[in-house]
Amino acid sequence: MQRSEGGSETPSTVALRTSTSAQAPVVQPVPASQQRVLVQATGSSQKGAQVQQLPVPRVQQVPQQVQQVQHYHSQQVQYVEGAEAVYPNGTIRAAYSYNPESQLYGQGSGSAYFDSQAGGAQVTTVVSSGGVPTHGMVGIAMDVGGSQIISSGSAYLIHGGMEGGRHHTSHSSRSSSAMLEMAIENLQKSEGIATHKSSLLNSHLQWLLDNYETAEGVSLPRSSLYNHYLRHCQEQKLDPVNAASFGKLIRSVFMGLRTRRLGTRGNSKYHYYGIRLKPDSPLNRMQEDTQYMAMRQTPVHQKQRFKPFHKMDGMGDSLNSGSQHLSSTPEQSVAAQCQHHQQYIDVSHVLPPFPSLDLGSCPLPESISMTDVKKLQSSYRIHCEATLDVVMNLQFHLIEKLWQTFWHSTAPSSDGATTIPNSEEDVEDIRGFPRDKLITLCKYEPIKQWMRSCDHILYQALVEILIPDVLRPVPSTLTQAIRNFAKSLEGWLTSAMTNFPPEIISTKAAVVSAFAQTLRRYTSLNHLAQAARAVLQNTSQINQMLSDLNRVDFANVQEQASWVCQCDESVVQRLELDFKATLQQQSSLDQWAAWLDNVVNQVLKPYDGSLSFPRAARQFLLKWSFYSSMVIRDLTLRSAASFGSFHLIRLLYDEYMFYLVEHRVAQATGETPIAVMGEFSDLSSLMPSLKEQDTSFSDDMTSDGDMSRMSERSLTEPAVKRERIEIPHSLQEI
């Protein structure tokens, strides 16, 4: 672009042209003192079209020859005013950020330019600088490749869009750079960071923007994010900041980020809430590296038994470009989805140590030595670690192949594949024994009980990996994958152990059944939690629920339930008042969970350290369910408007109470929750103990003193009341 030769102290005019055709532009001059330029260009394909002219206040006709404009860049048009020098391309800031999608554009400061495309086009443009009064609007009408721009106020709404193949302006890069500048400026003001460190901060912040994004209802472990950052600094040979400073960097980029402590009791960790890894981030494949092995607290030199995902051709190149698609085939799409889901599971979990084998006074079977026993222990440990690896990588279908390999099954797997180990060494580590010797060892009672205990530990670890927090939002695709996995477990095990004795299969199947049932229950609980979360966040629904609950006749409920539950009336009244108060405070789901946890602690505290703790816990569940059903019954009879909300809340609270009680019982007995829930899975082997528990329960319910008092009352009370109190013999037998 060149200056006008006639430029002087008098007001001058400058005209711009964006057409590439040879037709001379129609120039409407404007005084430069008004700081406005009106450009009208007509392409060769639009010769017959009418030119739309926009009224511009205070425009004067100044006869002056204007030289033809020279283009410095095919994608930008710049202008100069008066005696100003020509701006070199690339030194001005964009006034408008562009996106090929429909986008609302905000006006920025600085010199303005508009993208022009090759080919025929009609453009009518008025560019206004800051000198224009507030009532002087800037109007733009374009017809480029079918796009239409509507001017309203200072915002420009584009319908349609330019051809993607011809447009090269990146909105994301400009918005990212703006975010970086803003974040660095905030850090310099708040933390007093020197200006010479801005380039270092820029690399750290850019890495955060490239790999993370905001997402509602999602959390990420704080330690995992910092480990990712340390790895990045190590690869780029940068000096990392400490964890506290890194937290400030994150909050400077992702405004409003919250911190929560999530996880099960005794294993909770701090999480950033509202941020997640981008699906195309290379950090999703960290489990393939030694850093991932170190995060799992295993030796770096330990070999990986089963590779979670095979490296795809050209993936190394695609990792460096966020614009490229990560997966192009169905197999790669599944792999990418699994990697994305791993942020919702606990990938830092390790397999706890197994208990020692107690042979007692049982002699070893013939042809079995202690060397064989120790070899079985080692092989089974390797087998369980391999199981944990494939579940942690969400490769559920490999469980079937693992079982077939260990139990020497010759049956084909459900997907037609036959092998999974990576080498012959892996086969030897997993199998370890011929089938005949393996059957003999599994029939040996101490070995059978030891493997049962190992299975309880393994499957409890798998539950804590897949569902670390039952109340945390989880994608429905991951939940469905876990439920399908649970549905297939028993069939896979039965197929893999076809040639084994039934007593061995039943022992293994009982634990697997408890594991599958736990996965189904926890995923259902998680689904209920997400549905109830929306109800508890709705103020109008909460007010309606409180109004309906105040109409319930709790005195009548207590009178009907007291005969069955025999609960202390003061305890029931306290729970009623606490429930109403918590509902009135419009508590969140996490606050309700804390309230339920406190209720369980208060009720079961008198039984701590007692042998009757498991029975007291089960009785509490029955009584809680009975009372809640009585309240729901009253709401139903009254046609309460909030009945649906109460029904959903009741289902969630009953299920969460079940979850809390089973963990309390496991803690009191020193067992895993899987072992507690699998206690009655194999009824045939536990019938004697069941009879003993029934006898003790009957003795507790009808002690000698109770029976004597009951007989005394029966002599003095009317016959009608005796019918309500006396327990029939058939009921006592049951």
From Swiss-Prot:
Region listing for Disordered, in residue ranges: 1-31, 694-722
GO cellular component: cytoplasm; nucleus
Primary subcellular site in the record, as a coarse category: nucleus
Membrane-crossing segments per the record: none
Compositional bias of kind Polar residues: 1-23
Domain of life: Eukaryota
Keywords: Cilium biogenesis/degradation, Cytoplasm, DNA-binding, Nucleus, Transcription, Transcription regulation
InterPro entries from the UniProt entry: DNA-bd_RFX (IPR003150), RFX-like (IPR039779), RFX1_trans_act (IPR007668), WH-like_DNA-bd_sf (IPR036388), WH_DNA-bd_sf (IPR036390)
Ranges annotated as biased composition (Basic and acidic residues): 706-722
Family statement: Belongs to the RFX family.
PANTHER family registered for this protein in UniProt: DNA-BINDING PROTEIN RFX2 (PTHR12619:SF17), RFX TRANSCRIPTION FACTOR FAMILY (PTHR12619)
Protein name, as recorded: DNA-binding protein RFX2
Taxonomy of the source species: Eukaryota, Metazoa, Chordata, Craniata, Vertebrata
